[in-house]
Amino acid sequence: MSKIIAINAGSSSLKFQLFEMPSETVLTKGLVERIGLEDSIFTITVDGEKQKEITNIPDHAVAVNMLLKKLTENGIVKSLDEIGGIGHRVVHGGEKFADSVLITDEVLADIEELSDLAPLHNPANVVGIKAFQEVLPNVPAVAVFDTAFHQTMPESAFLYSLPYEYYEKFGIRKYGFHGTSHKYVTERAAELLGRPLESLSLLSCHLGNGASIAAVEGGKSIDTSMGFTPLAGVTMGTRSGNIDPALIPYIMEKTGQTVEEVVNVLNKKSGMLGLTGYSSDLRDIIAKEEEGDHRAKVALDVFVSRIHKYIGSYTARMKGVDAIIFTAGVGENSAIIRERVLEGLEYMGVYFDAKRNNVFGEEAFINFPHSPVKIIVIPTDEEVMIARDVLRLGNIG
């Protein structure tokens, strides 16, 4: 048995989960927030109870030291020698990484180089990796990339209709994201269906504040809705999803905003927040719709219609589907959104059962038994995928 930490480092946060492997038992989990700001918050779960501490955490190295100290203080590990491996979520692996990889100096340099493609995320991921290297230099560390799963997409899916030299010189192409989540739920779907993954055509709907759809054929991603960045695809909480690119100079001209300001609007002030004017949270928007709010209704209609576009096009790409999977915050917990997405899909063999659909955050088949296409709710678990990859690549006994 070995203890493995799964880490997701943001620019001012550090999310962690400690596993006993290979049993995949979660020993503890927690979150460090507001790193580098006043009143940093450290939260850890001990014996099922959340402990919260407000303190000064100036950087990620201090956060890591505090985390490791809490593990020993609370008897979660007897000593740091019990930690056999560390897995780091890294947002962008570009074309260089089609799988998770053991972190070396060379790999770390490559991740830093790819920061151009993910300026908000990769630098923070690197800071997290370096912080652990300082404290646990001899413990194997593995990078798990959000983009890696989608590296199986064919050129017809990942190339944009732009001058080919842009792809050759600048790496401009579709990369896709949420790969670790799509991989987990499609593998789990095959187990639940009792069929080999290689024989299945699956539609994976990762619907949260960020949302993406993936077409997975024979266990391989053949297309996905996010693009060069996580801004593309379906309408999201605060992100616009796909728009006509000519809108950017038009908005700049009309508002006097810079490119950076317009892109910030597309990332942080658009999507459901932009359409409603008051919230990015679908629960708020559904409640408002029930009160008769027109913009809430329109926003929800837009959200569902954009998902339908991908379901239709990916079903055509795969010449039919065996199952549709719902995962992430909205996909796992909103029976209303699932119902609206599935309504009217009988033409493609989708027959959902409204009674069975009344589930929240648990695995369930929500189709009628006679439905040719199965519909499965599967809570995602990116952390366990990270831990599995550490076990697989870290030579951990």
From Swiss-Prot:
The active site is at D146 (proton donor/acceptor). It catalyses: acetate + ATP = acetyl phosphate + ADP. Keywords: ATP-binding, Cytoplasm, Kinase, Magnesium, Metal-binding, Nucleotide-binding, Transferase. Pathway: Metabolic intermediate biosynthesis; acetyl-CoA biosynthesis; acetyl-CoA from acetate: step 1/2. Mg(2+). Can also accept Mn(2+). GO terms for cellular component: cytoplasm. It is an enzyme of class 2 (transferase). Catalyzes the formation of acetyl phosphate from acetate and ATP. Can also catalyze the reverse reaction. This is Acetate kinase. It comes from Bacillus cereus (strain ZK / E33L).
